[in-house]
């Protein structure tokens, strides 16, 4: 009974399983990430939803730090390099594009267009409509192909695609203008006499044409052009890296990376290893010198000690000789003293004998003391 009552939940509350709770948390997290998703050509999300910069190839921790990364020095340098590469690639293309249109317009204007004005007015709407339809279909095909292939390309080339589309639009307008002039020539040819038609059947249309007909423009995704642009950008970057002086960038790591030189840390490690090797060599040489000096000092000390020992032995010999001399002198003095004592004893014994003799005599006798 107690277990059943404890298993019950209080009234008015809903029991949520752990799986459902996890699902709700994941959904909430997905909604929050979708809300904060950054819309930028350089922002890239992986399958885990982590933000990174495709231009710098650096991960960004959160969407709040994206603005600081965009304002950073490394990102701005990469954007400037990309803009410089775009200017370098657009320069020659812009200079060479208008040439064929100029040739066409000059060739068409040189012809007599006054004779075929009526026929031109009839043919012009149909040709302009067909050219417009062709341009629209080409643009749609290029847009579809670019949308398919753009998924595999880096986002830093999206701006290049837009600029290429603008250039194609400009070229389409020029082609429209030229197509307006071409029907003039066609109408004029239709209005000409039959002898000219016979000559055209015999001879080719333009036997002295120095300009060969150009291949029709086929809409494509622009991957070939982008590969060429990428190669030009890489070559330009290599040339700039070779031309840049040392210390061009404030950050030493970026400077070394651009100039294709070892990083300062690696350079310092190499210098530290070389310094340690040199110190080891110096230490070995100094140790050998110290060992030689120690050996010489040891020999000098041994020679000095031997000299001191010899001097000490000499002093000991002198002291021994002096001791022997003093001993001999003492012996002589002692022998002399003994002899003197013996003599004195003999003299004393003689005096005592005489005194005893005198005392033994009778002093009263006349002439006894004499």
Curated annotation (Swiss-Prot):
InterPro entries: Matrin/U1-like-C_Znf_C2H2, ZNF830-like, Znf_C2H2_sf, Znf_C2H2_type. The keyword Cell cycle applies. One of its GO terms (molecular function) is nucleic acid binding. One of its GO terms (biological process) is negative regulation of apoptotic process. SUPFAM superfamilies: beta-beta-alpha zinc fingers. Residues 156-171 have a biased composition (Acidic residues). SMART domains: ZnF_U1. Pfam families: zf-met, ZNF380_CC. Phosphorylated in response to DNA damage by the cell cycle checkpoint kinases ATR/ATM. Residues 90-99, 121-134, 196-212 have a biased composition (Polar residues). Residues 16-40, 310-338 form a coiled coil. May play a role in pre-mRNA splicing as component of the spliceosome. Acts as an important regulator of the cell cycle that participates in the maintenance of genome integrity. During cell cycle progression in embryonic fibroblast, prevents replication fork collapse, double-strand break formation and cell cycle checkpoint activation. Controls mitotic cell cycle progression and cell survival in rapidly proliferating intestinal epithelium and embryonic stem cells. During the embryo preimplantation, controls different aspects of M phase. This is Zinc finger protein 830.
